[in-house]
Amino acid sequence: YMLHNRQNYDFSVRTSSTRTNKTESGNGENLYGTYMSDGATNIRVNGNEYADIFPVWEWDRIPGTTLPAGEKRNPVDWGSKGTCIFTGGVSDGKYGVMTFKMDDYGVKAQKSWFMFDNEVVCLGSGIGSNVPTDIVTTVNQCHLDGNVWINTGKALQQATQREFAFEQAPQWIWHDSIAYLFPQGNNIKLKMDRQKGNWAKINFNYPATEISMPIFNLVINHGQSPRNASYAYIVVPGINHPEKMKTYSCHHLKIERNDTEIQAVNNRKSGILQIVFFKPGTFDNEEIKVKALKPCVVQIKKSKGKVTDMQIADPQNQEKLKPGVDVIIL
């Protein structure tokens, strides 16, 4: 679990591993919370984004997750261990990166979240599935609050339809003080409609009275049985009006790698480079060369061209890694 707090927002990621239990289901509660420990994210600016939303949630579209279409009821009471070994992160207390190598429900994916002052960069690679249904990465599913604006690169338009599909993603989508940028141009689907449900579906102790709420539902669709698919999106919270996106630029953020060996993001404004090594290897962007002798997560701080700080961690929680020994700056 990693929580990233800033003055204008907070962002959290929840994962599981072979060392931890997933969410529990007992006493007739949390009946569809199966996927809540599989990379679930919360993006909050005003604090009410998910308030009492759960009766109408599509539980196969939990924000942050990469999953097969179709809700799945929790099969085991009181929790079960996760299936993934490579899960964890690194932080200096201000910036951090979280990673999750998923292999469950017939889906494989390598997912990481790179957290900076004003943005969170979300990357996925190596996405594959033997499940004969669409595999979907959910960007967000929250209350629909106010207008939605879409910048296609050619025009800025207010979303008036209930549903949009983009084979090539727009530059950004704005809703409720949060902007979502799509630098990779994935297949994007957006729904803005009322979703129906009831509390009894997820908790036997509550009434089955139907509830209906307007929901903002934004996903990346990888299609059926993808092979080595990937995604990239950037969350920019705290943008209180779409007009402010006219002066916003993410050019200081560079996605250096997003493949099955390395995921890396370079924030040239803050001098922070974050790297996930899924296997031993070398990262080289012509500005810095980093060699990892073991799988790890690395965060490097540079100032005036010199490395001033570095944190490393083993997401497999097997050993304490050492700078200059297990991770070497060449």
Model segments located where?
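Beta-strand-rich binding/interaction modules
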Residues: 24, 320-330
